[in-house]
Amino acid sequence: MVLGKRHGSLIKRTTSMKMITLDTPTIYDASQPSDHLTFHQHPHNPMVVMASNYDDFLKTCSLCNRSLCHHRDIYMYRGNNAFCSLECREKQIKLDEKKAKTGFVTSKKPIRI
């Protein structure tokens, strides 16, 4: 018996790739002026707008509301929760665990009719 080789049914290839259409990029002549702006020249770059929308949670600590400095470490928890210190982060984790635990215990109580 040879390790790593399996004998069994072969997988049949399908023709699904024929159904996919690709958009080919349009090539513009550089000698003619164009009103199309490149990604870097666009004044309203959606990536920049998106980044500025998400930067709001990086201004203050999610627990004590202390302002977060740019030159200091920021401790993250659950994606959009920023904390000024490891202690604040751990306090929030313990609070969330306590909420989850008490919510779980109360849901086990039987409902009386």
From Swiss-Prot:
User: What domain of life is recorded for the organism?
Assistant: Eukaryota
Q: Where is the signal peptide?
A: none
- Give UniProt keywords alphabetically: Cytoplasm, Metal-binding, Nucleus, Plant defense, Zinc, Zinc-finger
One GO MF term: kinase binding
In this chain, the FLZ-type zinc fingers fall at 56-100
The induction text for this entry reads:
Up-regulated in response to mild as well as prolonged energy depletion.
User: For this UniProt entry, what's an example GO CC term?
Assistant: cytoplasm
What's a BP term from Gene Ontology annotated to this protein? defense response to insect
| Traits of the deletion mutant | Promoted M.persicae aphid population development.
Where does the protein end up? Nucleus; Cytoplasm
Q: Which InterPro entries match?
A: Zf-FLZ_dom (IPR007650)
* Self-association state and partner proteins as the record states: Interacts with KIN10 and KIN11 via its FLZ-type zinc finger domain. Interacts with KINB3 via its N-terminal part. Interacts with GEBP.
The further comment given in this record reads:
Overexpression of FLZ4/IRM1 rendered plants shorter which creates mechanical resistance to M.persicae aphid attack.
Record function comment:
May act as an adapter to facilitate the interaction of SnRK1 complex with effector proteins, conferring tissue- and stimulus-type specific differences in the SnRK1 regulation pathway.
Member of which family?
A: Belongs to the FLZ family.
What this protein is called in its record is Protein INCREASED RESISTANCE TO MYZUS PERSICAE 1
What organism is listed for this UniProt entry? Arabidopsis thaliana
Gene that encodes it: IRM1
